[in-house]
């Protein structure tokens, strides 16, 4: 695939970028060079190569999935104006 001057102008218009005629011509060459590099990458044989999620080996550290109350009840109700046994006390609004 190659990029021509018309394609560069169309992309610039779609991106709402003002591009001068000489810049568009320069970008045509740059985009063709980039696409040439991508085509080279497509030619590389990667059969048998396992896909990677990172360039460095990483292990997910796992913890036991244990349900707890968090032991934060006192911290949670500490700033409440009224509490009773770690519950918020609120005025009655429905009769």
Swiss-Prot record:
Pfam families, sorted: GatC (PF02686)
Keyword set includes Coiled coil: no
Recorded superkingdom: Bacteria
Biological process, per Gene Ontology: glutaminyl-tRNAGln biosynthesis via transamidation; regulation of translational fidelity; translation
Keywords: ATP-binding, Ligase, Nucleotide-binding, Protein biosynthesis
A molecular function (GO) term: glutaminyl-tRNA synthase (glutamine-hydrolyzing) activity
Reaction equations catalysed: L-glutamyl-tRNA(Gln) + L-glutamine + ATP + H2O = L-glutaminyl-tRNA(Gln) + L-glutamate + ADP + phosphate + H(+); L-aspartyl-tRNA(Asn) + L-glutamine + ATP + H2O = L-asparaginyl-tRNA(Asn) + L-glutamate + ADP + phosphate + 2 H(+)
Enzyme class: ligase
EC annotation from Swiss-Prot or TrEMBL: 6.3.5.-
Family statement: Belongs to the GatC family.
NCBIfam families per record: gatC
Assembly notes: Heterotrimer of A, B and C subunits.
Purpose: Allows the formation of correctly charged Asn-tRNA(Asn) or Gln-tRNA(Gln) through the transamidation of misacylated Asp-tRNA(Asn) or Glu-tRNA(Gln) in organisms which lack either or both of asparaginyl-tRNA or glutaminyl-tRNA synthetases. The reaction takes place in the presence of glutamine and ATP through an activated phospho-Asp-tRNA(Asn) or phospho-Glu-tRNA(Gln).
Protein name per its UniProtKB record: Glutamyl-tRNA(Gln) amidotransferase subunit C
């Amino acid at each position: 695939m190659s990029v021509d001057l018309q394609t560069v102008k169309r992309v610039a218009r779609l991106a709402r970028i003002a591009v001068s005629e000489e810049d568009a011509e320069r970008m045509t060459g740059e985009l063709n060079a980039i696409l040439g590099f991508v085509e080279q990458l497509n030619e590389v044989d990667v059969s048998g190569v396992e896909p990677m999620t990172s360039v460095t080996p990483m292990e997910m550290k796992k913890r036991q999935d244990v349900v707890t109350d968090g032991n934060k009840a006192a911290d949670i109700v500490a700033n409440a104006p009224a509490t009773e046994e770690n519950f918020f006390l609120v005025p009655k609004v429905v009769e």
